[in-house]
Amino acid sequence: MNPAYSNQATVDISLDLKCVQKIMVPGTSVKSSKEALRLSRIYPDVIYSTAGIHPHDSKSIIEDPSSWFEFQEIASSQECVAIGPCGLDYQRDFSEPDVQKEIFEKQLLLATSLGKAILIHERSAQQDVLDILDKFQNLPPVIIRSFMGTAEEAIKYLDRRFYISLTGYLCKDKSDTGVRRLLDNGTLPLDRLLVETDSPFMYPNTRASKLPQHVKTGITERSLLYLHRYCTFQRNEPCSLPAIVEMIAAFMKKSPDEVALATSFNALKLFGLS
């Protein structure tokens, strides 16, 4: 969980606006997973937590092996509905690749034993991620979170029946082979799609010059009001979710209600929410 959200203000804003009904707070280390669990107990049935060791933080488990036992206890909690984000990130070298792989596999084993969905973080490491995932025969549902890759990379995930989760990165992707193409050409079906804000990152800049006009006009005034009043480039918020859904709908040439209904159903099913 990002330190920016250690207080309740960001939760209260989104719930008061009624733009979201449930919030997933991810843990990216033992400490932040514990804090995410604490928040989920303050807001039962509204906030849910995940327990993850982000690739960047993998070395912390090697440095303090006993912390893994505390992590297992957190992950086993009822309020924790998924394991992750976990995976591999070769864009930065906060943890050595071999260490990342070791801790990634430990989390996959844990998720499989608990039967909880897996949130995958992958940057410039797809083949190694796939090689590790392919070792497991009976994985729980796998979600590729905050996907920023190419359409070709997405197909490799979709062929394995994984889910793809998209963010406001849509506004930044200017390539002909990336996320936008996934939506434009129907490569990404609704029954494999999730939507997230990845707050406080991935602010959806609806004023981006390369954002198609039909996408800009597809964003409602109400969603823009939430976005511009409560979010900034430095601090995205959960209340940006409606704008992201509307952009995705415009790219897919579907109604926002259809996208919202499908992605909400997927989330409820995958994470066992009521």
Model-derived features: positions:
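Mid-domain alpha/beta scaffold segments of enzyme catalytic cores
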Residues: M1-S274
